[in-house]
């Protein structure tokens, strides 16, 4: 019978020394009851000390609650049911919400009560809002809710009910829904109240235990907790010998004996939440008459751990002192959930979120005041009544018999709670009745409400505020400091961080959990919290029909694409006072102060409208994936130059917007051309209007005064005139939009707001939107364009470095870069319209270290003939036939080529391209109208060069490279011009002047190229190019010239040069047969002996190499089809089938050489007379080009006979031009060692490719070009076979 003694009170009482038969005495001295020497480190105990409580909610539960609310046609209350469990590692708790209870009405209760709650159920009162737009910063708890929750916590801790951790967390949720055609978006606002008291535990030496049946049971393998499958706890007392006596929790003697601590069983770790709960019960149990603490205020915990045979002993110290009082904590969470209506809810992927105590918002203020009132009341109760509450005495203690016995314990508590919680119905009633006019709000809120009367109905966070107003008048608690609306406006105006949390607007879990840092970054300006919400809501209401139609995208983006900076989370960011002027949190970087006139012109209310206008897009779309604050700022500056033409100068508007206007962030999502979602939106022109409000003073007066007069008329109470004001505001918004649109149209051609042009260029809008949206994101990765431009115009984003890497401040560089990129835009737009235009330089626009953007184009163009006008220029040509085909303006040719030079070569401007990508489009338009200005381009180039010189390292090895390349580019450019348009000969002469001056200046400057940063960027470029090579050979090849190819090959010629690129090798292994590989290996063995002349000859032969490499015979049908479809292979004469993406470097180099050959065909004779510098690759390139001169410089299309003949004709027709263009090239010295733009192993792409087969004579070039099997000295087969295959 002994094992059951612990369970049977009669036996226990007779056996225990504490029974009546054997008197039990506590040690007469209460000092030194145990040895307090610590044996380990201390540990803190609290529910959320190690980990925030986690919520796991099933989707079906939310759907059921939503359906129930819709059926009831009102904001109905209901219950969600779940269970609270400790995590496996016992460091936190998880609340699983998986059931729905509509509740039932009870006559004597104002609120519904649970239909049938079972023991262990975690009850969550829930309110679902389906008919109104609620504020993201809604206050879930009313004052009554807080009061009842605190009382419930106190009752449970102080009572003798069985301890339930779930009762120590009082949770409520408000759900707001927004419905679209096929989906519903829910905002879940969770708020939980728990105790903040924590404990500090320190392990101590073992204390002897009286070996009672209970003690033996707990030490055995099958103890109570294991048998019952749950943890058990009880109390500790001591006998005269200072041995511990274990008592069950239900033992009546617990309440009459002095207690020294608690024991627990069935728990693994001391930091388990159950231990914390038991400590709270021990400290606050009102039935315990005497607790004996050590001299330092500690009590004992004996833990029978599941992993230890012997019990563990701890000293536990209440961090609040020996006589602690209740401290409470508010935990909140906000989640956004996007569900499709007709999709079966998956139970496998529940919604997960965390309850955290970090946020400081209006609800936190209410809570702190409610908790203070509660503590005041409790202390007064203690003073007035010496007895403990009657309801706590329902166990068998004898002195209880003298007091009336209440209803059994668990139920009275819950029933009391329900009676104490009439707040939800009352709250909804107050809100439904709109504002209580008798309680005027502070001025800031008045302004908000006056401006946006309808909002008040829809702002959920105002709802909680209303009860406070009500309570302020009617509840005594308020007098003691109950939260009221007054606190909120003050917070708004003072930069109180308390409201900061408001700025976390409906952020999806990814944002909240993934980027805690970002979340913190928002805090600094929280003062604007709720107010901006109000305006955002207003916008959604008043301008809903305008905006909502424009932005159909909203439904599903929030969860998937929340930006790390979460611009959309800033909608509340709006202002009540000038110093708060809606500055987005992300842009809180030090920013230039607003010019005084700017601030005066910017009307706050209009500002609100503008924010509101876009907030629906941003907050719903979640589209602004901004890579970095830098990018955001730069983009914002660019974008805002056009939004504020009327109010203040564009320049200052830029500064203003980037620094203080939330719009500064939004336009990324708003502007069609710059937003990832832009292509979905109707037109970029439709959106800017709202931004104009910022600087448009006239609308401001309208907005300001109308509401004010109305506010004087009592609008604070939202009188029946509310809807009239709403319609008035709607009208004003439409008026503003119309004005803004007119302003934009008027401003579209102004250079000060280049972006406008892009906006207005609706013809190109579709394509450009795609391009810029890819480029404007500062992602360095390969953004394949959609549609035709996938392979053709990928050049722009493929070869640009990430914007954030090293953005060049130099505006001129940016201009040139944007010019280039604008060409790319034109091309990509054209490619759709002009099937014949083959991928030109645009596709390889930023090709790696391929300097001659223009040259490559020439080669391509020459091959494809003038009718096929280079893809780049196609658009330009149509628009401005007088301008040379390639460039929107005559100057652009050189500026672009040189810009490319400084860009890919120096690498630096590439970055600036990205940072300024948003300007791409705008620059394009102005360029079309700009007259050629040689001096301007010259200065631009010099600016770039100087900048590069400043940022480059001291490597003097490569001074002439840039000059040479530039000269080549320009030469080729001129060739293009001559070949394409004789009428522009005079222009070319001008260009020569500019070119010569530029080269002279470059030489005098001693241009240096390969700084480490540039090397890095070049490496980046080459990586991109190598990827592109597989997609479009011309995208890479057309961008190569003899110079860049020579630079590629030179590394192989120089003894310390890097050998073959892995990619080139892999591709060669894939596409070349054994004979070809063996030829390559043999020819390469002679490579090192080549002198410049032999190099030249090899050069000429190089053209044949590409034939076999590119041959479509080695391609899959899908690849050939793809290449044909996008104009990467020619369909005429099956020449397309002959051309194939070879390896990046090979094809590039050969193509370049061919181009060079073509461009320099007249120097056939000089082919064997390269420049006097044997080392000069330029000579090689010239010679190679010369070599090709006799032969057609056509791309090595085996069957490309027609094109070859065309090219021949072109060359023969205009040999003078070509020769003339070539002349500058040999003059420039490009030493072999210095031409290695890609000196880096990563750039091996162009590593050891010997470009110039020495064995071939120039005259043989054509023959070999036509012979498909000929392979030049190109690759080292031995090395090839040693390297791993990449495909």
Swiss-Prot record:
Residue numbers of Phosphoserine PTMs: 395, 753, 779, 1135
Chain positions covered by the region annotation Disordered: 378-417, 508-533
Residue ranges with Polar residues bias: 517-529
Region (Interaction with RBM14): 1-1018
Region (Interaction with CPAP): 231-781
Function: Immediate-early gene. Plays an important role in embryonic development as well as in cellular growth and proliferation; its long-term silencing affects cell survival and cell cycle distribution as well as decreases CDK1 activity correlated with reduced phosphorylation of CDK1. Plays a role as a positive regulator of the sonic hedgehog pathway, acting downstream of PTCH1. Plays an important role in the regulation of centriole duplication. Required for the onset of procentriole formation and proper mitotic progression.
Name of the protein in question: SCL-interrupting locus protein
Organism: Homo sapiens
Phylogenetic classification of the source organism: Eukaryota, Metazoa, Chordata, Craniata, Vertebrata
Primary gene name: STIL
